[in-house]
């Protein structure tokens, strides 16, 4: 296929990804207002984000496996419909519980879009050329991430719209994406025997859910070291062990265990978990920091994150083209991990009064690091598996990245809540005010607080936000160690077979194998 033909075929897919990213990020700057209006607290704030990531995590391998069995075009259209349905329902939510449930529906659709975008690109484009188009995908993600917070801020700040329109704004784009997908995406349908590992999917979902519930509630509803923690951790471990046993024995497992005999996949998974923890877990609270600690409006909060998104846009597009030209990718993963770690560590120094230009530089480093790492980890994995396992292998990386993100949001959200409580107690005690007063369970509206108390609240959230970025820095370092240990295999120019590299491939594939 020519470059133009590929772009035409990918246009609807890229538009669908844009809808998913836009509909997710448009909420980020509106969340403080949404949670305040729905009378929620820090735990609800965390779960509105975590619920979507959890559903995305749990369903990504299912969508990936289905793509190896059914029409990829039909599946991506179905995932888009599910995502839009969740968005419309979320716009009708009257309580934080209803909103969280609707966000789960959104996450199911997002899991399909996340997994299928990578799988469809891998089906159409040889690995050597894929870096170029992965850059386009990264650019679309960057534009959606840039536009989302800005649009969300404008919607929230416009009195005759209100935050509910944050969930409706993506619907017209979704309808257009469905039409374009129907007209432009042409993929061969490969008929295979249908074997879905529902037991494995159920056990994996249950294990991850229990783990996230424990992380979210520990330190708030009960102590980290308590009988409740022991029961939940033991339960998650037991469910995880059962899932591993089921996957090992399943005829067609959801996450094929033999993939992890591939060194590249194993190390890419470790790096993806680390990137997910840092990227989702730390950056999701930026809007809260800018609005509560610095008193910014939702619109201004979106504008203030532009350096991070700009770094992501530049690195994903430029590096993708360079990788296509050279066929070499490892050095960019290493550089990206270094920048990511440095960005997190530097953001750990931020406080309520940190000069903005310092934060802009630090956020740009994080954006550059994510842009160099996220898509190229998937690319490295796809280069080492046979064509009929592209869906499973791609979804494995996306699964663990989303898992890392969900764990990161839950864990770092718990850290944020704990640190805010401690810092506010210290600050209020210096004013002679009991900490149980203004430090209640809801998110504060700093504009309604008396001057001295507002200063305490702003300082508490600023210091706590710095703490969670500092806590994310070791995960960037873990990603660096993992990518350094990956053995680079030059990108092949054909989808016919993986590069023969001994044990580097999951299984030997005869030449000429076709999807």
Segments from the language model and where they lie:
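Transmembrane core module of solute transporters
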Residues: 5-60, 199, 213, 224-232, ...
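C-terminal module of multi-pass small-molecule transporters
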Residues: 11, 59-64, 68-81, 89, ...
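Interfacial helix-cap and linker-helix signal at transmembrane-aqueous boundaries
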Residues: 34-36, 66-67, 151-160, 215, ...
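Helix-loop-helix hairpins in multi-pass membrane proteins, especially solute transporters
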Residues: 60-200
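A membrane-interface helix-boundary motif in multi-pass transporters
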Residues: 157-168, 217-229, 297, 418-473
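Transmembrane-helix exit segments and adjacent C-terminal regions of multi-pass membrane proteins
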Residues: 1-13, 443-515
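Hydrophobic transmembrane-helix bundles of small-molecule transporters
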Residues: 157-271, 278, 296, 457-463
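Structural signature of transmembrane alpha-helices in multi-pass secondary transporters
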Residues: 20, 49-52, 56, 83, ...
